[in-house]
Structures are given as C-alpha cells and as structure tokens.
C-alpha cells in the first residue's frame, strides 16, 4: 500500500475500512489536517487491491481499522522484515519511490504533490489546478503504476 498510494505511515495505519472506496480503488484518509500537509485522496493499484482483499479475507474480527497494528509494532515488524530480507527499504523510501515513479510516468508535480497530501495553499494554484478526486483518479489510472514489476526489474 505504501508504494502505490504515497500515504504517510500514520495515514496508512489510521485507515478504517470505511475509508476505502473499492469501486474506485480510492482512499479518503480522515486523520490528518495539518497546516502544510493535508490528506486529500489516495489511490491504490490492482496489485495492492488483490493483496488487501486477501489480507481482509483472513480477518474474522469486527475491528473497523483496516490494519490492526500499532505504530510501535509496525516499526518492529518493518525492521525485522528489512533485516531478514537484507533490503534497506523504509516506508519513507517507498513514499519517495512513489513520487519519483509518478514523475517518471509523466505526472505533473502539482498532481504528485496532491497524491502525497501536499495540497497547495495559494489561491492561484487552487484556482487553476483541478484537484477534484475524479481528475486525480483519471491521472492515477493513466499511469498504471506497477510496484512489483518495477522492483523486480531494478
């Protein structure tokens, strides 16, 4: 999910099942609204959709959270997996990869920023940048961003 959404750690870990629009593969995180960083909408690819559905099928609880792990446990699991695999990949590295990959696929910076929750504050940018969820979905779908294929090649 990190690599295909551009979400921050706490945005991802705070997601609730109701934040996911499966029909559009869209996430509307509601947990972050700072002065410079705001959650807007995020999208996930078919790879993430398949993995997420597989994960949710194993859950037999009524917990509304999408991921049942605390930030502290998540960090521990992430460090363990990184150590065991020998790959020094962090959540921030995946977020940066997402930004770089979207740029490589031709997405203008203002939309990459929007995907990553960096919505412009200026009146000019707000007025002349179409940041509607429908427009962002259209742009995201055109990229056909693939994570596993890219990681296998590099």
Sequence positions of predicted segments:
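The alpha-helix within a helix-turn-helix
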Residues: 2, 13, 113
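Conserved tyrosine-mediated DNA breakage-rejoining catalytic core shared by Y-recombinases
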Residues: 5, 10, 14-54
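C-terminal secondary-structure termini that scaffold catalytic or DNA-interacting sites
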Residues: 135-154
């Amino acid at each position: 999910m990190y690599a295909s959404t551009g979400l921050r750690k706490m945005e991802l870990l705070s997601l609730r099942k109701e934040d996911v629009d499966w029909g559009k593969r869209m996430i509307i995180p509601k947990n972050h609204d700072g002065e410079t960083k705001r959650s807007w909408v995020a999208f996930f690819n078919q790879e993430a959709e398949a993995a997420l559905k597989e994960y949710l099928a194993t859950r037999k609880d009524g917990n509304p959270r999408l991921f049942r792990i605390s930030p502290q446990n998540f960090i521990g699991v992430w460090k363990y997996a990184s150590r065991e695999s020998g790959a020094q990949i962090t959540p921030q590295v995946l977020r940066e990869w997402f930004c770089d990959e979207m740029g490589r696929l031709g997405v203008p910076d203002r939309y990459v920023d929007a995907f990553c929750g960096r919505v412009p504050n200026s009146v000019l940018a707000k007025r002349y940048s179409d940041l509607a969820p429908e427009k962002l979905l259209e742009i995201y779908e055109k990229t056909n961003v693939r994570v596993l294929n890219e990681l296998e090649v590099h």
